[in-house]
Design a protein with these regions (language model features):
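Transmembrane helical cores of multi-pass secondary ion antiporters/exchangers
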Residues: 1-331
Length: 331
């Protein structure tokens, strides 16, 4: 146990030092966390053999709850409102079209099945919320045309949509699913997710304005519990927990609540640690020696997604809004 704690402390320190280095050379720090995980993995100097995917899924789910909740909490609705329509369009229809485009590519170029290709597109079609929030807030970029708000709203809301598409495709791959059942899944995911997130946030604001915590710091613990509740409650009845957490975060972040500055400092630290944990675990699970057989298809998917599918979808959806070409290219 002591050796595990020692390793944990050293990994955290190494990641923090990497943060200092990457900020100087302009590289996303999350890539450094991924690299540290790979160095600690089975093919790295430490030869740590870790393949507990169930534990990784649980830890990453918890991490995403806080990352997405705080992503919503940090959005200024006044700045985001003018671009909300475009952001929602990108995060819904945009993710679906990207997944469909990648499905076609995987089917004809890589000779996968239609559903397997669609699954690949659904998993990869959304922008990574942790990366977007990390880059925009650490670099404090002064982007024109409300692009920063557009990226934040889209990246926070497209993960729930990608999760929904992935769930539907997996259900189609593993069981016979009727059209009615599919429509109900979509309805439940969206309505329960949005509804429970909004109601929980409103009740939380009402409670915080009337209840006084006797011990300093318990308000932040309470808010962490609300973040977890915002995910768990809709999931229990078939709703989208990530969408609920995001909606709850947006509403709470734009309300006047006591000790809000303390909440920001608390979640800054928590989400920083969660991002470190997610990408370190992904690196730890990676086995570079086994990448040889899949590296070319993976690179082909990455290139087509980055330089063909995503730009085409963004262009189709944003051109009617008369979005400037530089904004479309950045998005």
């Amino acid at each position: 146990m002591n050796w595990i704690l020692l390793l944990l402390a050293l990994v955290m320190i190494a990641c923090i030092l990497c943060n200092k280095l990457t900020s100087k050379i302009g590289m996303p720090v999350l890539l450094a966390f991924l690299a540290v995980g790979m160095l600690c993995g089975v093919d790295g100097p430490l030869h740590i053999r870790f393949d507990n995917y169930a534990l990784t899924e649980t830890l990453c789910t918890v991490a995403l709850i806080f990352i997405i909740f705080y992503g919503g909490f940090g959005i200024k609705w006044r700045a985001a409102k003018p671009v909300a329509g475009k952001a929602v369009l990108l995060s819904t229809l945009g993710v679906f079209l990207t997944a469909a485009a990648m499905g076609v590519f995987c089917r004809f170029a890589l000779h996968t099945g239609w559903l397997e290709g669609m699954l690949m597109g659904a998993v990869l079609g959304s922008t990574d919320a942790a990366s977007v929030f990390s880059i925009l807030r650490s670099k404090k970029l002064d982007l024109k045309y409300g692009t920063a708000s557009l990226l934040e709203v889209e990246s926070g809301s497209n993960d729930p949509v990608a999760y929904l598409i992935t769930t539907i495709v997996l259900a189609m791959m593993t069981t016979e699913i009727s059209a009615g059942r599919m429509l109900y899944m979509i309805f439940a995911q969206i309505v329960y997710g949005v509804g429970i997130g909004a109601v929980l946030a409103v009740c939380t604001v009402f409670f915080l304005r009337r209840f006084r915590f006797e011990t300093s710091g318990f308000d932040t613990v309470f808010m962490a519990a609300i973040a977890i509740l915002s995910y768990v409650l809709p999931v229990l009845i078939g709703g989208n927990g990530y969408l609920s957490a995001y909606i709850a975060g947006i509403i709470l972040g734009n309300q006047k609540i006591p000790n809000k500055k303390n909440q920001v400092h608390f979640f800054d630290g928590v989400t920083g640690f969660m991002q470190l944990m997610v990408f370190f675990l992904l690196g730890l699970l990676c086995t570079p020696s086994k990448l040889g057989s899949v590296i070319l298809p993976a690179l082909a998917i990455a290139v087509v997604l980055t330089f063909v599918a995503r730009p085409l979808v963004v262009g189709v959806l944003l051109t009617p809004f008369r979005a400037k070409l530089p904004q479309q290219l950045l998005v």
